[in-house]
């Protein structure tokens, strides 16, 4: 694991109201890095950056959940004398983040279906030629 990169990622996970990163996000970051390191190809810098993206998305997702708790799934909207109900855009954003997290986890081969797939072989036989 690249320790300098890890320190940078921990700074990104800092809670603005606290002096240290969110413990739950740190645990998530470390467990995903550990799971990547156990793979046959190990953990490289690109994988570590993707893990940081996943944990940052989790942080954003929690903020969106808080907004949904406060304002609800639909919100009252007023335009002059008109009053309407409209969808809370946080719901759509949470769905997008969840899909992106799923794609990142699949790319890291950390989902059950992605583990079943055969690993991509980069050996084209040129070395044997």
Question: What function would you assign to each model-found segment?
Answer:
Residues 15-16, 92-119, 127-129:
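Alpha-helix capping/hinge segments and adjacent helical runs
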Residues 1-86, 90, 127-129:
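Extended, surface-exposed interaction regions
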Residues 124:
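Low-complexity, rRNA-contacting terminal tracts
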């Amino acid at each position: 694991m690249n320790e300098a990169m890890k320190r940078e990622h921990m700074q990104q996970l800092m809670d603005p109201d606290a002096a240290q990163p969110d413990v739950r996000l740190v645990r998530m970051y470390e467990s995903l890095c550990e799971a990547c390191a156990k793979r046959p190809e190990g953990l490289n810098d690109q994988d570590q950056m993707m893990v940081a993206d996943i944990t940052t998305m989790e942080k954003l997702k929690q903020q969106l959940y808080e907004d949904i708790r406060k304002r609800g799934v639909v919100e009252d909207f007023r335009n002059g004398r008109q009053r309407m109900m409209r969808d809370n855009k946080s719901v759509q954003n949470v769905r997008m983040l969840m899909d992106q997290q799923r794609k990142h986890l699949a790319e890291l081969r950390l989902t059950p279906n992605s583990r079943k797939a055969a690993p991509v072989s980069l050996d084209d036989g040129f070395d044997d030629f």
